[in-house]
Amino acid sequence: MANIKAKKYYSYAKINLFLHILNKRPDGYHNLQTWFTFLDLKDQLTFSFNNSREINISSNISIAAKQDNLVYKAIKKFQQSYRVQDIGVDIEIKKNIPMGAGLGGGSSNAATTLIALRDYYLPQLSNEEMIPLAAKLGADVPIFVYGKSAWAEGIGEILYHKDFSPQYALLIKPDIHISTKEFFTSEDLIKSSVLISKDLGFDKSIMHNDFENVFYAKYPEFSQYLKELDSDFRMTGTGSCFYLLSADKNKLEQLARKINKPLDKWLVKTLNYVY
């Protein structure tokens, strides 16, 4: 197969507008309900396919070794599932989405890799047809393959297109590393089998992130600071990034200027579509 010109793809961040944990499944995953929307915060992945039969991944930051890297795992799953052999590709990842933030950066990169492989090897394959494969890579990967704001159930692979009214989002991230496994097993995580109707609009009174209680119990000082800034800050995923939504960009800019702690922060917009 001949070399082709390098092709660039954007790999977007997501937030969970709410996250409701239902129960643990026999396979170790948890059933959940959530509403995903995207942000215009994005990584850039450049794919250069070639005849080398080698997979090379580089980045502007330190990344996991091949066998632990979701991009590499996505390539191997694609090969196994669609019987595509002898893949040769150089992938350059320019990271802008912070890692370990609950913004889905690694999952987004894996999904973008599946789409790039599809475009090159199996262009007749639809995004929706790749969702079962995406789910094998992780609970957040399917939404990035789907590419539209969506209500999600199951482990995140059962998706219903559901737009969210576009807003600005102020993101803040403390220098805190979250153990997803620890949060899922925490006594402070309250699981409920009561389902929320996907037909509801965005209702802050019932739509919250079940992991916030775990975070608040573990980091009470930061949690108090957050509430003093604005009580409507919400956590995405298992954190450690929090966001505040508003249609008023100036309000968020003013609030960002008030932050007097060494926190990473971004002012971004929500997106309903990324493809």
From Swiss-Prot:
Pathway the protein contributes to: Isoprenoid biosynthesis; isopentenyl diphosphate biosynthesis via DXP pathway; isopentenyl diphosphate from 1-deoxy-D-xylulose 5-phosphate: step 3/6
Annotated Pfam families: GHMP_kinases_C (PF08544), GHMP_kinases_N (PF00288)
Coiled-coil residues = none
The superkingdom of the source organism is Bacteria
Annotated active site residues, numbered on this chain, are K14, D140
Cite the InterPro entries for this sequence. GHMP_kinase_C_dom, GHMP_kinase_C_sf, GHMP_kinase_N_dom, IspE, Ribosomal_Su5_D2-typ_SF, Ribsml_uS5_D2-typ_fold_subgr
Which reaction is the catalytic activity of this chain? 4-CDP-2-C-methyl-D-erythritol + ATP = 4-CDP-2-C-methyl-D-erythritol 2-phosphate + ADP + H(+)
Binding-site residues for ATP, renumbered to this chain:
P98, M99, G100, A101, G102, L103, G104, G105, G106, S107, S108
One GO MF annotation is: 4-(cytidine 5'-diphospho)-2-C-methyl-D-erythritol kinase activity
Give the EC number: 2.7.1.148
Keyword list, A-Z: ATP-binding, Isoprene biosynthesis, Kinase, Nucleotide-binding, Transferase
Name a biological process GO annotation: isopentenyl diphosphate biosynthetic process, methylerythritol 4-phosphate pathway
Q: What class of enzyme is it?
A: transferase
UniProt cross-references to SUPFAM superfamilies, sorted A to Z: GHMP Kinase, C-terminal domain, Ribosomal protein S5 domain 2-like
Record function comment:
Catalyzes the phosphorylation of the position 2 hydroxy group of 4-diphosphocytidyl-2C-methyl-D-erythritol.
The entry assigns this protein to a family as follows: Belongs to the GHMP kinase family. IspE subfamily.
The protein in question is named 4-diphosphocytidyl-2-C-methyl-D-erythritol kinase
Species, as recorded: Francisella tularensis subsp. tularensis (strain SCHU S4 / Schu 4)
Taxonomy, top ranks, is: Bacteria, Pseudomonadati, Pseudomonadota, Gammaproteobacteria, Thiotrichales
